[in-house]
Amino acid sequence: MPAFMTLYDESIDPTNRDFYAPGFELRIDGVGLPRGVLRDVMQVTYHDDINEIDGFELTVNNWDATARACKYIGSETAADLGGGSKATQLFTLFDPGGKSAELAIGYSGNFQSMVRATFTTMEPSFPESGPPVLTVRGSNILKALRTKQFTGAWTNQTPSAIARNFNTLRGGSQPRLPSPWKVVTNSQAASAESSIEYVAQKNQYDVDFLLQLAHGQGYTLEADEDARQLYFGPSQSSTPTNYQLGYGKGLMSFKPSLATANQWKSVTVRGWDRQTQKPIVVKVGQDDPQVKKLNSGLLSLVPDRQEQTVDLPVFTAAEAKQRALAIMLDRSKEIVTAHGKTVGLPKLRAGTLVNIQGIGARLSGTYFVTKTTHTLGEGGYITEFDCRREDLGGGGASS
C-alpha cells in the first residue's frame, strides 16, 4: 500500500515553516528575475499531464504608469533592441527562442522545482480598457527532442528496461533519439520495479512515450542539456507526494463522474500465429483475477455488459492475452473520473496518487492523478487536478 500524506502532515513539516505564504522563483538563463519584474508578474500557472509535455504560463503587467509606455513589448524602438541598456534587457527578457527558464513554486523558504523550459510564446494584449498585459508561455526542454513518431510494443519488461531500450532503437539508419542523447536510469529504483505485461507506443514521439511511461510509474523524465542525457526515474529535484484529501479538509471541491456505458463483459482478441499458421483467439473477462482486483467495489454498479471482439496484430497467444488484459484494465480505470481543487500543493503532480475521503463508500478511495494545474495569483495558490479511480484493495472504500 502506498503511503499518503495529509495536509496537517504537510503544514507541520519544518521545511514548510511559512506554509501559508506561497511564492515562486523564476530564473532565466540561470539569473533570477529583478525585483521590479517580479512585481509585474500577476499570475503564474504550471501544468502537467501524463500524456503531454509540461509547461508554464506567466501573466505580466506590461504597462509603466509613470512613463506611460509599455515595459516589455509595444514601446520599443529599433535602437532599443540593438543595445545593451537596461531598457534593451527588459524588451528582450521574455523573447521566445533560445532562453532557458527554471520555475519553482511553493512556500517561503521551500520552493519546489516544477519545470526547466524554454520560452515558446510571447503574446501581448492591448485591450480597449485597462492596461496592456503580456502572456508568456514556456514548454519543457523535452519538446525539442520531438523528431518522428513511431509505433511499437514491449512485453514483460520493467519500465527502466524499456526506457534503456531507446538507446539502441533505430529509425532506419539513424538513432531514434537525436544523437548524442542517451537515456539513463536509477539503478536502485530499477531494482525494485515489477515487469509490465504489455505496453504499446502508438504513433507517438519517443520522448512523449517515455514521459507517459515515467508518469505511470510515478517517475519523471528530466533532460540534462549539458550531458545530453534523459534521466528516467524518481525525481532528482523534488519528490512527488501521494496525498490524502478529505472533502472540507483541504479538498475545496471534487466533481466525480461515474460512467458505465463503455464497460465490457469481456474482450476477445484475435490474431494469427505465423509459426503454426493457425488463428489465435484469446478471451479475457471481468472474472479475470487482475481485472477483478481493480475497482472491484464498483463492478456491481455496471449494468449488463456486452462482449467485444477485436482484431489486432498479435502473433502468439501470450501476446493476445496481454493485449486483452490491457484493454479490460484500461476500461476499468475509466469507471470513475474526477476533477478536484485543493490548496496549493507543489508536490501533487501527474502520476501521483490521491486518497479521497469523506464522499461515501462508492467514491472515496484511491485515485491516479492524470493532470494538474498549479495557479499562483491574487487569489493565492490553488492546485486543480484530474484523476481516475484506481483502487486495488479488492473492495469499496470507507467513507
Predicted regions mapped to residue ranges:
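Assembly/oligomerization scaffold segments
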Residues: 1-145
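Surface-exposed, non-catalytic interaction/assembly patches
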Residues: 2, 34, 71, 146-155, ...
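Extracytoplasmic
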Residues: 21-23, 39-41, 53-55, 96-100, ...
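An acidic/polar, Gly/Ser/Thr-rich interaction patch typically located in mid-to-C-terminal regions
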Residues: 46, 51-89, 250-399
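A structural signal for the main folded, soluble domain(s) of proteins
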Residues: 101-102, 124, 166, 257, ...
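Extracytoplasmic/secreted envelope proteins and their assembly/folding machinery
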Residues: 116, 160-163, 207-211, 251, ...
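Short, compositionally biased
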Residues: 117-125, 236-238, 367-378
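Charged- and aromatic-enriched interaction segments used to assemble
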Residues: 130-248
